C-alpha cells in the first residue's frame, strides 16, 4: 500500500453517441492497440444490429445485459495455516461493472459468428434474455461462492 497520497481515479467521459459512461468504458474495453475508432465502430454497429433484431432501444438492452451479468459474490484465495481456502467475498460496485464488461467481451470473442459486431450483438441479446456464456460465468461464480460459504468467517 502506498504511504503517500492516494492516486486520483481518472474520470472517463461519456461516449459521444449515447452520452453514457458505461458505454464509454465498454468501448475502451473492446479497444485493442489504441484503435478507439475501430472499437466505437464495433460497439455502435452491434447496437444498431440489436435495435434491428430486437426492436428495442439498444442502450436499454445493453444496460439489461450488464445488469444480468454483474456478480454479487466472488471467491478469493486466502492462505490459513498451510492450506488455501476459497473465501466468498462481496464484489464492490465498480468491480461488478468491470467484471460484467470483461466477461461480455471475453465470451463475445469466443462465439462462432463471422464478425465481431455480430458476436457482440448476439452475446448482448443473450445476456439481456438471461442466457449465454457470460450469464453462465456469473452463475458459476455465485455457485463457487455458495459452495464455499463455510469459509466466510475467514473474510478480511
UniProtKB/Swiss-Prot annotation:
Keywords: Ribonucleoprotein, Ribosomal protein, RNA-binding, rRNA-binding, tRNA-binding. The keyword Iron-sulfur does not apply. One of its GO terms (molecular function) is rRNA binding. Pfam families: Ribosomal_S7. One of its GO terms (cellular component) is small ribosomal subunit. It comes from the Bacteria. GO terms for biological process: translation. PANTHER family: RIBOSOMAL PROTEIN S7. Part of the 30S ribosomal subunit. Contacts proteins S9 and S11. One of the primary rRNA binding proteins, it binds directly to 16S rRNA where it nucleates assembly of the head domain of the 30S subunit. Is located at the subunit interface close to the decoding center, probably blocks exit of the E-site tRNA. Belongs to the universal ribosomal protein uS7 family. This is Small ribosomal subunit protein uS7. It comes from Syntrophotalea carbinolica (strain DSM 2380 / NBRC 103641 / GraBd1) (Pelobacter carbinolicus).
